[in-house]
Amino acid sequence: MTTKLKNASNLSESAQVDQQSVQPFTRSQKVYVQGSRPDIRVPMREITLDVTPTDFGGEINAPVTVYDTSGPYTDPNVVIDVRKGLGDVRSAWIEDRGDTERLAGLSSNFGQQRLADPELTKLRFAHVNNPRRAKAGANVSQMHYARKGIITAEMEYVAIRENMKLQEARAAGLLKQQHAGHSFGASIPKEITPEFVREEIARGRAIIPANINHVELEPMIIGRNFLVKINGNIGNSALGSSIEEEVAKLTWGIRWGSDTVMDLSTGKHIHETREWIIRNSPVPIGTVPIYQALEKVNGVAEDLTWELFRDTLIEQAEQGVDYFTIHAGVLLRYVPLTAKRVTGIVSRGGSIMAKWCLAHHKENFLYTHFDEICEIMKAYDVSFSLGDGLRPGSIADANDEAQFGELETLGELTKIAWKHDVQCMIEGPGHVPMQLIKENMDKQLECCDEAPFYTLGPLTTDIAPGYDHITSGIGAAMIGWFGCAMLCYVTPKEHLGLPNKDDVKTGIITYKIAAHAADLAKGHPGAQIRDNALSKARFEFRWEDQFNLGLDPDTARSYHDETLPKDSAKVAHFCSMCGPKFCSMKITQEVREYAANQRIEAVDVDVAKGLAEQAERFKQEGSQLYKKV
């Protein structure tokens, strides 16, 4: 997966899937839950657990169902060929609605130019359909359907997906314990229904990013009353990285749990790279269109025009991009407010638009043409991700006048988008110390009327280059608890360089931890099922189950094997931290056995006496380390 473009043969003939991304997870199987029609098949991952040994034969542990973003890549029954892309999930749903039309060809000038260039043949994805667009006068957004009282197939799909077979889990006893959460005003029901999904989308509190030209998509939902989602970034740059490498990063990222992926490519062949990514992506793809627009004017921000940007939006919408980051809130009057900052404007998109505004001394053309942008968005059902171009790039600049001024403008733009029934989420910081994070969330809810919040971290301190996945993971967990709907991952390479596959995985796992911690704290129904199952496996020394229930089984198994590499250690009733004689869980088990043998009903027996007797018994039995399984 490391062949550079200059050495590439025809990608439509040579491209191969990243083999690491298609390996099934140990003791896991892909399962599908069918909806009201045969073609609504919602994927989940089911983890099979070992039997707990008992004196009477064994206790069966029910399988645990977990959310699965990996798409068909981890289904052994699906043949993956990245040259042809993934299978079609949504075309029948879209056609049945009867409000779209198939175009005769691409309608963007740039798209037509790229298609006509014979030099690009060897790089081009070969199996591209003509795009769809809304019929004249039609609005094909999920918000428009929701406000008309229509429950779409996409809405039913995400309702099934969010529940993760919760009723079956309760019946199997997997949720005997779950702490009450504190949701800070979120309205999370005990069960997610299609009607609840429709209501949340109609209200603007949630979005389903689902471009009608991204038919390979497995729909998902972003909103404060649903599971906290994470986004992973990929994309080439002028410094290198091939199309195959970016597709490999995509498949690798979704394997580990990236709910959406943003293609932030800024180098050559942006158009072709994006086509390969979308055709092979089961998750929503987001972009920052101003990056490509800037490439078209050779990096000179002053030369950007509305007409060129409009063509870029149509080009990307016809490829199937699900959400656009658009920095329409960077207004001319806000730019001087950044002069006194420690780190000024750190957003690439924000700095591009600030430079354009100052060069022309005119208002941001993304702001002045916002209604026209909405017309494009609703013709393809592209969601807004309103960019925070003035986000703080250091904790010193957090919550300043420029940041919150822009946020108020984003609230104004949100209401304009909603008048067009266009789905919308709001991007947030950035670098914010812990004590100022809740103010960010509260102000966003107030200004943007509960539109989903999507933040980059935030990083809670600036002193740890190389560890900013940790500095930001702390802030991400906090703001996710307070109500943030999606967290944009940060890798260890943040501020330092382009992430490789290992960095991508580290960033995603860090953010899956933050998102899950937030779900637990909010009291999301069923959030504690996996924790309970892993804790039980840990107490019962079911090592393989501990590995397989974890977010990263490979690393857990590797760390265990560094100290205890033999297979016999997988049935040991101790770990390398405490050893056999000092394992608290082993001692607790023996105390419980003692209590049961003495017919003491309460577990709070004379612990000192119990421990002394068990210690003597351990010595008399020859300090036996293992129990037969």
Curated annotation (Swiss-Prot):
Residue numbers binding substrate: N233, M262, Y291, H327, S347, R348, G349, D388, G389, L390, R391, E427, Y454
Broad class of enzyme this protein falls into: lyase
Cofactors that this protein relies on: [4Fe-4S] cluster
Record's keyword terms, sorted: 4Fe-4S, Iron, Iron-sulfur, Lyase, Metal-binding, S-adenosyl-L-methionine, Thiamine biosynthesis, Zinc
Record bears the keyword Zinc: yes
Record's keyword annotation contains Ubl conjugation: no
One GO BP annotation of this record: thiamine biosynthetic process
Positions of Zn(2+) binding: H431, H495
Protein purpose: Catalyzes the synthesis of the hydroxymethylpyrimidine phosphate (HMP-P) moiety of thiamine from aminoimidazole ribotide (AIR) in a radical S-adenosyl-L-methionine (SAM)-dependent reaction.
Family: Belongs to the ThiC family.
Name of this protein: Phosphomethylpyrimidine synthase
Lineage: Bacteria, Pseudomonadati, Pseudomonadota, Gammaproteobacteria, Pseudomonadales
Gene name in the database record: thiC
